[in-house]
Amino acid sequence: MAGIKSTMDLVMERAARMGMATPDEMRHEERLKKGMQSTAEYLNGTKPSLAAILGEHEPSEHASIRKGMLTSLLRNLFLPRDEEGTKRIERAVRGIIELNKDTPDIAALCQELQTITSQYGQHRTQLYDQLKEQMRMQIEQMLMRKGMKADTSKIDPTMEPQFKEQWTRLEMDLDGQYGQALEQFKAQLKDWTGV
């Protein structure tokens, strides 16, 4: 966690660099920024292809813009909590592969990364459902011990503080396990793509 910088830290570092940057360095920074902005549009679905966006610029600008694109794409590799997150990761992976189409190892690594995020989603759903069922049964048993008839269709164990507490703990453990694997893949991708 010590290696992760906040957005404010990054902004402050960039501001410090800009104060003493050469014109070439400033142009490089602008191209990086342009690449990141283009990637945001791509990830949001307003731009169909990163290669097409890259083609709109001078060849001399491609390396910096591509680096900005890859930086942004790598930041969008995370453990998805919903379908929208999964789709965003899939789009980010497609973008990484598109920008590195001459490197089959990157495509294979991206496939493994998608497998990890998919397994995370399945494992997360499975744990959630198991905990929910376990809590529902505990509530039902408690009501029966008190002599009350339990209407299982009206029992929502997710509203119980104990459920929320246990789910938070389980989710943190799961995030830790899968997060570590994800970070290893991201580090390898950064290394191979030169970001």
Sequence positions of predicted segments:
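Conserved NTP-handling cores and scaffolds of large molecular machines
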Residues: 15, 19-22, 100, 124, ...
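Amphipathic, alpha-helical segments enriched in basic
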Residues: 13-14, 68, 95, 103-106, ...
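Generic alpha-helix signal with a bias toward terminal, lower-confidence helices
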Residues: 16-27, 50, 54, 81, ...
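Long, C-terminal folded domains that constitute the functional core of proteins
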Residues: 29-37, 41, 60-64, 68, ...
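Leu/Val/Ala/Ile-rich N-terminal alpha-helices, chiefly Sec-type signal peptides and the beginnings
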Residues: 1-62
